[in-house]
Regions:
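ATP-binding glycine-rich phosphate-binding loop
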Residues: 45-63
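Alpha-helical protein-protein interaction elements
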Residues: 15, 24-27, 51-55, 105
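Juxta-kinase regulatory segment immediately upstream of eukaryotic protein kinase catalytic domains
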Residues: 2-45
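ATP-binding pocket architecture of kinase catalytic cores
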Residues: 53, 63-172
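Residue-level detector of alpha-helix boundaries and kinks
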Residues: 17, 21, 47, 134-137, ...
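A short N-terminal beta->alpha junction/helix N-cap motif
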Residues: 20-23, 50, 78
Length: 173
């Protein structure tokens, strides 16, 4: 990962981005601002609400942005470091299998930006009552999780995906 700076986009024609988002590369920030501007009218986005949603162990970053129909998620995955094709392929397989995954609304493969539906900020663990493992609410959540796992198991994808073997695991680490 790289150092973070607070470079800003001086072009007033760009959307007013939330200054809480930091960019190490001013060119990447400008590309993001231009891409976001193109999505704003189409999806009713409010660029000033862009904020960090989460990050993972890769170069990908995730932002949450408010829109006319609620919040959406933006994935920033620089193409030089991240290939989003496997993500898109798996997302489409899971969605076709009726698994609760974010819907891909827009994908700019060349720039590595993606607009996704937002499943919310809460994880399964955060919704459980840890000191009451058999509580009714917990049971309902566990049942929902099991139903999702069953749907995943019913997806016939062996011929569409590379095997997740030791070599692939090592590349991802």
């Amino acid at each position: 990962m790289s150092d973070v700076s607070t470079a800003s986009v001086p072009d007033s024609s760009q959307p007013n981005l939330n200054s809480a988002i930091h960019w190490a590369d001013p060119a990447r920030q400008a590309a993001f601002a231009a891409w976001l501007q193109g999505q704003t009218a189409r999806h009713g986005l409010r660029p000033e609400t862009v904020r960090s949603a989460s990050s993972d162990a890769s170069f990908r970053r995730y932002f949450r942005v408010d829109g006319a129909q609620g919040s959406l998620i933006i994935m920033d995955a620089p193409p030089a470091q991240e290939d989003c094709k496997p993500f898109v392929q798996v997302a489409r397989l899971l969605e076709a299998g009726q698994v609760g995954v974010p819907h891909i609304l827009e994908w700019d493969e060349a720039q590595g930006f993606m607009l996704l539906s937002d499943l919310g900020a809460h994880t399964l663990l955060s919704t459980l009552t840890p000191d009451q493992p058999y509580a009714t609410g917990n049971r309902a959540r566990y049942n929902e999780a099991l139903e999702e796992l069953i749907r995943i198991q019913h997806i016939q994808a062996a011929d569409q995906l590379k095997p997740y073997d030791d070599a692939l695991l090592q590349r991802e680490m």
